[in-house]
Amino acid sequence: KKYLAFLLPIAAMFLSDISLGHKPLISIYIAFLFIIPIGIKLRKKITYFSIFNSSIIAAILFFLITNFFVWINSSPSDGLYYCPPSLMGIIKCYIQAIPFFFNTLLGNLFYCFSLFGLYEIISKRKFIYINS
């Protein structure tokens, strides 16, 4: 049921945004729609290499998509962070976002390796049940 791979994360994010009082940001939902197929493909063959590559690709996609929307929605009232609607504006937008990219990448690598590693440990472990 691949549709659940899309529905559950998007619904969970939407509900958490609403319950926390955050305005849902369409750019984040769109980024997730591009990232979820990477996770679906990753499930077919989980290796250190595939986890590493998937984490990097997901971080790059998230960076490109969300910051493109930041640039599109930028206005002069943003002051120092204003990115004009030009080639230099989008370049400025992406340059300003680089520190956030590294945090996203490190988070992806940490959580992907932790979660997939934990899954591998649990799935290969044999549990012995003792009746008392």
List the predicted regions and their residue ranges.
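Interfacial aromatic-anchored transmembrane helix boundaries in multi-pass membrane proteins
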Residues: 3-41
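Membrane-embedded alpha-helical hairpins and interfacial helices in multi-pass inner-membrane proteins
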Residues: 46-129
